[in-house]
Amino acid sequence: MPDSMMDMEHRDHQLHRQQQQSHHHQPPRLTASTSTFAPPAPAGSQSEERDRDRDRERDHHLHHHQSNNVASSPLPVTASIQLHQQQPQQQQQQQPLTQLQQPQLREREHHQQQQQQQQQMMQQPQQQQQMQQPQQQLPHSHHALMQQSQQQQAIHRAEARRADEEISDKASTCGKLLIFLSVALVIMTLPFSLFVCFKVVQEYERAVIFRLGRLMQGGAKGPGIFFILPCIDSYARVDLRTRTYDVPPQEVLTKDSVTVSVDAVVYYRVSNATVSIANVENAHHSTRLLAQTTLRNTMGTRHLHEILSERMTISGTMQVQLDEATDAWGIKVERVEIKDVRLPVQLQRAMAAEAEAAREARAKVIAAEGEQKASRALREASEVIGDSPAALQLRYLQTLNTISAEKNSTIVFPLPIDLITYFLKTNEATTQQNARAAAAAIGNTPPPLQLAPQQQMGQQQQPQYQQPQQQQQQYQPQQQQQQQQQQPQQQDQLYQQGQQISSAM
């Protein structure tokens, strides 16, 4: 509908321009009733005729557009009749309107429609929010109150600044007067005023100057000579060297409910002399108190084993916290170190007992591992000695050398191994002979009386017992001969070993 209205306005404007051009360029027309030349109509009548023609054309377009809409939409017959009845009434109302009033009315109507649409669009999301989030009204109201309070605070601050500026303007005149008087006083007492006006600051110091209670522009002065005016200037010396502070022992309850006493040392220095004087009353005292509280807070969030094993980490966290807190005071914390952690006596005893038990268990494990390794070594040595008798002889000689090296009054001289082996061999031979003799005696006993078949069996078995006896008789002279041959060799070996031992001693 707004597009059709715009088209109609455009067409009306074009028709109006065409009519103006036709009135300017066309000659006067003759009427149909008479053949005489009609006089030109006045300007007011012409404008009224143009307005009527334009209104008729507009009404015609409106009627045509409404008829199209009625044909396209399924309206009832009564609605179409009402529309036809309303059209002449609208035409009668619009005819007396002038050419300047019609566009104004249209613009007003269009503007009102736009405002109504915007209001509807703005009300829809608000209604949705109220339906969906009814519980968020209190936070919004609280937020609005906070904003109002912030605005009021900003207004008060602005008013205070204005008052300060007014006071400063008034004081500036007095300050200028006092400065002029002090300069005049210096000039009048020139030889003596030099001792009062010139000051010296060391390399590690800075001077913060106040003139009439305000900081001088340019920051702190120094090192070297600086100038002050008497009676109106004052200054404060600030030492920039690093200072140490021993934090006294602090009783702290750890996270696992153990009471410990912890002390530390803090290294800090003044990084900004002006800020350290202007922002805090006593920067050094404030830093020391803050170090104590930071030590308590940091230790209270740790377990006992963390305090004992992670001292470097705790020191680093304390250094960062102190540095951030003292930055507004012009203080730079360079380092923090934990000195000592004192535990209660009962806890020390319990920890000592636990450590001792752990050490004993560790020692037992080590001893068991050593015995296991020693048994393995002895087993390997016995296997080697059993495989080669010469290794046993060498071991015997080594023991003799170690015994002879000791400075003792009594020397134990053990028997030679060869002699021991000889006795062992003879003992084995005698045992074997006794066993064989017993077997032979058993074989020579007569069998008991039995039946004929058993006697036959006894006769068959008799030669079996006689065979070992014959073998023993043959073996005994051979063994005796071997022993007789080995005796001189063994005696020679024993004699040589005795000489070696005597020479070693």
From Swiss-Prot:
Assigned keywords, A-Z: Membrane, Transmembrane, Transmembrane helix
Primary location group: membrane
Ranges of Low complexity composition bias in the record: 82-104, 113-139, 451-505
Region (Disordered): 1-164, 443-505
Localisation per UniProt entry: Membrane
Stretches with biased composition (Basic and acidic residues): 47-60
Record-stated family: Belongs to the band 7/mec-2 family.
Protein name: Band 7 protein CG42540
Species whose genome carries this gene: Drosophila melanogaster (Fruit fly)
